Amino acid sequence: MKEVPMILEICVDDVAGLEAAVRGGADRIELCAALSGGGVTPSAGFMQRAATYGLPVSVMIRPRAGDFVFTHDEADVMKRDIDAARAAGLSGVVLGASRGDGSLDMALLEDLRRHADGMDATLHRAFDVAPDMEEALEAAISLGFPRILTSGGARSALEGVKTLARLSELAKGRIVIMPGAGVRPQSVQALLDSFPITEIHASCSAVPLYDPESRVAKLGFTGAGRKATDEAAVRELKTILSAHHKGGATL
């Protein structure tokens, strides 16, 4: 039986968050913009900056907030963003696309996977809106995704833990089920005790000081939903995962 490394992926949407995640011990970065809206594709400059930290970085490929039903023109933008991630020297992309009924858009995802050939790829939480998650799991496997980021179709991974455990059982090692959404140091042990986990996703974010009376806020430039990566929370989460791994997690 070989040991399985426990990978902590931290999603960030600004340079300060990127640096906090690195200092806190993240193993991989999910690079986004506008996490308050669920995360969209970051700028080329942010991609280039992220490439200098020496960690694997996966870029969110999502041209806008809202649903995951994308037009032909939006798909073209997504391909160009994949090109930008590759040009920046980043290791992976985070993809997802739905049909009108919530099922995975197999044609578009296959096209995007082909366009990202040679890069690591994560299927994001578009998976969570699928009406049949077991069917979506098999679809993700057939598309060749190494992992799925999922909350088990719930608002948080902890709320969806039973579904996550079932998905992990059905996956049978064919694809990684990476829990995400609301993962905090205070709640992660309940996930770890529920099913075998080798990768976990978190933002470890906290709401920064926000003055609604400031001139910047009154002019509409500062959003109350903006959050900041908490380096201490990243470090605490990493410590818990490392202790769990040393406790005998094997494959």
From Swiss-Prot:
<dbReference type="InterPro" id="IPR005627">
    <property type="entry name" value="CutC-like"/>
</dbReference>
<comment type="similarity">
    <text>Belongs to the CutC family.</text>
</comment>
<dbReference type="GO" id="GO:0005507">
    <property type="term" value="F:copper ion binding"/>
</dbReference>
<protein>
    <recommendedName>
        <fullName>PF03932 family protein CutC</fullName>
    </recommendedName>
</protein>
<keyword id="KW-0963">Cytoplasm</keyword>
<dbReference type="GO" id="GO:0005737">
    <property type="term" value="C:cytoplasm"/>
</dbReference>
<dbReference type="Pfam" id="PF03932">
    <property type="entry name" value="CutC"/>
</dbReference>
<dbReference type="InterPro" id="IPR036822">
    <property type="entry name" value="CutC-like_dom_sf"/>
</dbReference>
